[in-house]
């Protein structure tokens, strides 16, 4: 319905105006390199939001990339330090919760994946690349997201929250 495009345009225009420059009597505004993060996406989800700005006879196309959480592997999240995606990593399994909830092997696999997440967060804190308060907050946020998202799937919720819920990272 264009709501997201309008919001992004407004946010970016505000940022551009805050950082405006006057050079030789000309106002320069530089729009930020923004992106939108989609927690849920499917094959119909576009790769970018598009806005066309018409000025007289000229058209300027403004494109805002869409980052889809499910397209990022854990390896990429840690490699690129996209840690803010960790709490939402569980969204990739949302459509499979019913199946995972009743399948011991899939539950074990999910738990192992989150044990890996917790271990990687621990490593990031020990190495000094991440502050312990950030690691703890990510664990808590991941736990909160799982509790809400998987509330109807007790086994899924239990396996992930047992791993992420009790993590206290002190260094």
Residue positions per predicted region:
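Conserved single-residue anchors adjacent to enzymatic active/cofactor-binding motifs
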Residues: 1-168
């Amino acid at each position: 319905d264009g709501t997201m495009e309008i919001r992004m345009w407004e946010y970016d225009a505000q940022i551009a105006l805050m950082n405006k420059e006057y050079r030789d009597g000309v106002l320069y505004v530089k729009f930020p390199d923004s992106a939108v993060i989609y927690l849920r996406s499917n094959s119909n989800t576009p790769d970018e939001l598009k806005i066309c700005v018409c000025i007289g006879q000229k058209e300027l196309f403004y494109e805002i990339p869409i980052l889809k959480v499910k397209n990022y592997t854990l390896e990429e999240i840690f490699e690129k330090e996209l840690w803010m995606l960790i709490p939402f990593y569980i969204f990739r399994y949302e459509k499979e919760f019913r199946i995972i909830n009743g399948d011991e092997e899939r539950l074990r696999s999910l738990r192992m994946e989150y044990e890996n997440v917790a271990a990687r967060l621990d490593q990031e804190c020990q190495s000094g690349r991440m502050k312990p308060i950030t690691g703890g907050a990510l664990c808590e946020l991941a736990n909160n997201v799982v509790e809400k998202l998987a509330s109807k799937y007790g086994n899924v919720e239990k396996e992930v929250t047992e791993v992420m819920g009790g993590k206290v990272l002190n260094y």
